[in-house]
């Protein structure tokens, strides 16, 4: 039987994943004196941070403008009140939010500010203050682009084309500790295995996108929570996934102005026939239906509490019934108004709630058709789809209720260290995100988590040397062999020396 071949490398810190959280962790490590840092990634242009967004992708931070008083404790209370968030983690996310945000400002993420230097916020969902801020639909993409530039300037070692297969562990008293990563270098003509010994592993693989059939996650995002669970890391809040309305030809959240301009919801049979405005069957009058559509703009995630009294999340249930139970197709049509909004064939704004009417009036969006209102309110929203060969002025947009974010994940302490010592899950893979937390907190949590993990490593493990090949094989040889046995294509590849 032949001997299994693999490469071996050592690094003080291995970071698995190259989204906004992982890149920021690498930068924070470098700035705190940890020079031996390696990022393992399937690709720098892959993943959720790089390839997702929304109408106005929000970053949540401590208030930094205006006269409304805010404090770290108040922000922590807001995060904690969302449910399934530990108080110490909420406090850390609030305390470090301004440091994380202004780092992004300093490296060039184009968050808007006024002439006096205030970064003026707005109220996002589940937000009692105005802590939300946005660089536009592509906030997280801008973040990753600037973070990649800074990481390269600082000399962070980035290895592309590696898929993590196993988190390697060793006994540590009654616990375990992470000692490295087994990966597949899959871009070679003949893929080869690589073992990395590490003193610390920062795990930033994002959400479990690959397990969902109907998803707004980018196709390049797969996830790696299962590897950590298999290694013995504890999970937390794993049932708390977030769902919402999204387009499926081009995967994108349909929040904000996409709803506030009051498009027409229609369903058809599988061949495009038997068209119906299906929302009419569930709402008692025009105002309740139009108000639910409007509110869906900033109440985008499905929330069972908002299904009562004809709330906005009733729309999610109705779409689910049409698509999953009735096997029909559902579309948003921006070329026409909902039938219930018409009087004598024209848009009748007197049928709107006062809130919706005031918003449309103040935004200068009182045109006749939804596409015209969208062009007035947010022309970039139209151009985004046009850049993906979808013309909202010429065709309806097919939609579904899609998995969008896992609010749960792996458990960690207030330094983002898991129950496996020297393993730090950060970003979406860490289950800190709660249930009813404000929009934009995930981006803040990812940045804060990277800073916190890097700080702990720099202050406690700076002198810790990574294990060599013999030490890794002695401690985790059986773990490596078991993974190779499962993934190798033939018996002759299943021997390990």
PLM feature spans:
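Conserved small/polar residues in nucleotide/adenosyl-binding loops
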Residues: 486-493
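N-terminal Rossmann-like FAD-binding beta1-loop-alpha1 element of flavoenzymes
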Residues: 13-36
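Core beta-strand elements of the Rossmann-like FAD/NAD(P) dinucleotide-binding domain
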Residues: 9-11, 191-199
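Glycine-rich FAD pyrophosphate-binding loop
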Residues: 34-50
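Conserved redox-cofactor binding core of oxidoreductases
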Residues: 100-192, 204, 248-251, 255-257, ...
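Glycine-rich active-site loop/strand segments that organize a redox cofactor
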Residues: 58-92
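An anion/pyrophosphate-binding glycine-rich loop and adjacent beta-alpha core
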Residues: 234-383, 456
């Amino acid at each position: 039987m032949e001997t299994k071949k693999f490469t071996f490398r050592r690094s003080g810190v291995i970071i698995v994943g190259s989204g906004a959280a992982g890149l920021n962790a690498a930068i924070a490590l470098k700035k705190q004196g940890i020079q031996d840092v390696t990022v393992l990634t399937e690709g720098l242009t892959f993943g959720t941070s790089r390839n997702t967004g929304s109408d106005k992708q929000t970053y949540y931070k401590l208030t930094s403008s205006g006269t409304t008083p805010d404090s770290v404790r108040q922000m922590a209370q807001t995060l904690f009140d969302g449910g399934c968030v530990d108080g110490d983690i909420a406090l850390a996310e609030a305390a470090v939010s301004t440091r994380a945000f202004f780092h992004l400002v300093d490296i060039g993420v184009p968050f808007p500010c006024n002439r006096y230097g205030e970064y003026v916020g707005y109220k996002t969902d589940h937000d009692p203050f105005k802590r939300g801020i946005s660089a536009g639909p592509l906030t997280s993409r801008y973040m990753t682009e600037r973070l990649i530039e800074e990481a390269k300037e600082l000399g962070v070692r980035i290895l592309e084309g590696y898929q993590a297969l196993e988190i390697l562990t060793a006994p540590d008293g009654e616990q375990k500790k992470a000692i490295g990563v087994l990966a597949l270098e899959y871009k070679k003509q003949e893929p080869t295995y690589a073992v990395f010994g590490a003193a610390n592993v920062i795990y930033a693989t994002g959400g479990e996108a690959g397990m969902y059939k109907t998803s707004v996650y980018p196709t390049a995002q797969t996830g790696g929570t299962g590897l950590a669970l298999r290694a013995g890391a504890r999970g937390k809040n794993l049932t708390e996934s977030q769902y919402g309305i999204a387009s499926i030809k081009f995967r994108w959240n349909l929040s904000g102005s996409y709803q506030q301009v009051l498009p027409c919801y229609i369903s058809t049979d599988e061949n495009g026939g038997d068209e119906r405005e299906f929302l009419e069957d569930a709402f008692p009058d025009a105002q309740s239906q139009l108000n639910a559509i409007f509110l869906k703009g900033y109440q985008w995630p499905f929330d069972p509490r908002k299904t009562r009294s004809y709330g906005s999340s009733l729309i999610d249930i109705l779409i689910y019934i049409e698509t999953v139970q009735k096997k029909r197709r559902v579309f948003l049509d921006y070329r026409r108004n909902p039938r219930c909004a018409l009087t004598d064939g024209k848009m009748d704004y007197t049928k709107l709630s006062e809130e919706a009417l005031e918003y449309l009036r103040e935004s200068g969006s009182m045109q006749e058709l939804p596409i015209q209102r969208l062009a007035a309110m947010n022309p970039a929203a139209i151009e985004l789809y046009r850049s993906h060969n979808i013309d909202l002025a010429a065709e309806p947009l097919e939609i579904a209720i899609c998995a969008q974010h896992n609010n749960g994940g792996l458990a960690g302490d207030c330094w983002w260290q898991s129950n496996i010592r020297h393993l730090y899950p950060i970003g979406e893979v860490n289950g800190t995100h709660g249930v009813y937390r404000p929009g934009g907190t995930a981006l803040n949590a990812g940045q804060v988590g990277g800073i916190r993990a890097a700080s702990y490593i720099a202050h406690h493990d700076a002198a810790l040397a990574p294990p060599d090949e013999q030490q890794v094989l002695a401690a985790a040889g059986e773990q490596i062999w078991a993974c190779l046995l499962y993934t190798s294509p033939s018996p002759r590849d299943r021997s390990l020396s």
